[in-house]
Amino acid sequence: MLKKKNQFDYLNLSHVLSKKKNSGGGWINKISDKLSEINVAEYQVVSKHSNYLFYSRFGLLDTFVYFLFFLCFFLNNVLFLAGVFHTKQFTFNEVNGFNQFYLFWTVEKPTDIIQASITYQISQYGIANLVFGLISLALLVFLSFRWTVSLFFKSQTTKWERIGYTTGFFISIVVYLLWILLMVLFLVLLDQQFFERDTQKIQSATRFSLFFNVENNNGVYLSKLNSFGVFATAWAISLVFYSFFFIAIFAFNYNKTKLKQLFKKSKAK
């Protein structure tokens, strides 16, 4: 049950909403009215059910988006790490070995190894990795928007909890946006500056892509992460662990009332 102060806020919001519906206005006012309707509906549900997240269509939407974000967030980073650690050694005289060297790109080996250039194209694996990242970023922005406008969330948290969660959300958006930009650069930018296409230069150069160096051992080429690749890999690993932090936040808020009751009982004893 909400506190009296929060009930007053919602009832006052309902009173304002009844005035706004006949006020007309442009699309901004219509959006504002719709958001007010959602907030009033949230109050009507939470006043009857303590488990708002599973009894309200708005709560179900928030819960669904939350776990969909976690899934896409997790898969994006796991796919990247799997692709990074999947690299194998290859030689230029193999028929198919060179094509399987990276999961992120489809590599067309030229017939004339000495004179021709290698063609790179992002693979379905690389596209899937990028799509999961873009979807999770969009979902994170949506969750941050819901956190900002929802009076239900504001009523269920203290001032310092709201400050902490809001700060965490926006920091997460910035960090994850930088990560997605890095993925776009890594997967999509098939520029000569980053990806060596001339086979003669590959045999003497060490940098094969943005994240990898290639060592030549008597015609056998072995890929290793360069310093930038190590940094990106460490970043991805930290994001995998960070994704579980969102599950912890959800579990804490879902059980916060019960946890407070247990804490009070243990303190009373």
UniProtKB/Swiss-Prot annotation:
**Where does this polypeptide localize?**
Cell membrane
In which broad location class does this protein mainly occur, judging by the first location in its UniProt entry?
membrane
Cystine bridges: which residues? none
Kindly list the residue ranges recorded as spanning the membrane.
Answer: 64-84, 125-145, 169-189, 230-250
Quote a single Gene Ontology cellular component term: plasma membrane
Keyword presence, Phosphoprotein: no
Q: How does it sit in the membrane?
A: Multi-pass membrane protein
Q: Which UniProt keywords apply?
A: Cell membrane, Membrane, Transmembrane, Transmembrane helix
* Protein name per its UniProtKB record: Uncharacterized protein MG323.1
Record organism? Mycoplasma genitalium (strain ATCC 33530 / DSM 19775 / NCTC 10195 / G37)
